[in-house]
């Protein structure tokens, strides 16, 4: 299983006693040591910045589907345990803490406690292959985490405006209204889903 800037199941990586043979066409010009070092660096960067810039090809989707199948124990299941995804990352050299892994789940919108134990294929694909505008999304989410002490995935309207009133160059009232429009909130909304906001903002930036 291989994706650009994401987790790859290599020849001897095992999940629940099963083995998956990865495709190595992107690294044929590298020797084994260089390939492993490059892959590990990309994997680490991918989880610290879980989104990458680039199209998702049919081959990548197929490889992700293969990995999802392996994690399902060889059965066609709709969901796989998120703990197995975490174990896979540990097996391929991504030594993430559980907190870092759960932060990655929050990035893809899995902020509700009842949704955190399982991932659908679309969630799995999203976790591994999303786009990003360099460091902006991570830095912005980190700023929201300061207000979201209990990791709910939401901030209040007041916290949202306070953040952008003090972040970098202060936003004007007009700019704040535009940001609230991106967040798709009106005057009656007090809670803002900041993951959804960052995703929408990043999508618009990437389309520029």
From Swiss-Prot:
Gene Ontology molecular function: calcium ion binding
Record text about domains: This protein has four EF-hand domains, two of which may be functional calcium-binding sites.
CC terms in the record's Gene Ontology section: myosin II complex
Domain EF-hand: 64-98, 99-134, 135-170, 171-206
PROSITE patterns, sorted: EF_HAND_2 (PS50222)
Protein name stated in the entry: EF-hand protein 5 variant 1
Residues binding Ca(2+) 1, per UniProt: 118, 123
Signal peptide: none
Coiled-coil regions, chain positions: none
Keyword Iron assigned: no
Region (Disordered): 1-34
Keyword line: Calcium, Metal-binding, Repeat
InterPro entries: CALM/Myosin/TropC-like, EF-hand-dom_pair, EF_hand_dom
Binding site for Ca(2+) 2: 148, 152, 154
């Amino acid at each position: 299983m291989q994706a650009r800037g994401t987790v790859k199941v290599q020849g001897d990586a095992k999940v629940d006693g099963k083995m998956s043979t990865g495709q190595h066409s992107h690294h044929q010009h590298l020797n084994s040591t260089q390939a492993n070092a490059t892959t590990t660096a990309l994997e680490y960067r991918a989880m610290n910045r879980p989104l990458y810039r680039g199209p998702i090809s049919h081959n990548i989707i197929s490889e992700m589907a293969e990995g999802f199948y392996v994690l399902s124990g060889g059965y066609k299941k709709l969901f796989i345990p998120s703990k197995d995804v975490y174990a896979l990352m540990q097996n391929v050299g991504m030594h993430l803490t559980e907190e870092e892994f759960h932060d990655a789940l929050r990035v893809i919108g899995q902020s509700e406690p009842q949704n955190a134990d399982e991932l659908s294929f679309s969630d799995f694909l999203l976790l591994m292959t999303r786009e990003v505008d360099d460091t902006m999304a991570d830095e912005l989410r980190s700023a929201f985490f300061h207000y979201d002490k209990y990791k709910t995935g939401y901030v209040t309207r007041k916290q949202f405006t306070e953040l952008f009133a003090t972040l970098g160059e202060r936003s004007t009232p007009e700019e704040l209204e535009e940001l609230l429009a991106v967040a798709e909130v009106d005057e009656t909304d007090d809670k803002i889903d900041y993951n959804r906001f960052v995703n929408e903002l990043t999508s618009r930036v990437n389309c520029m």
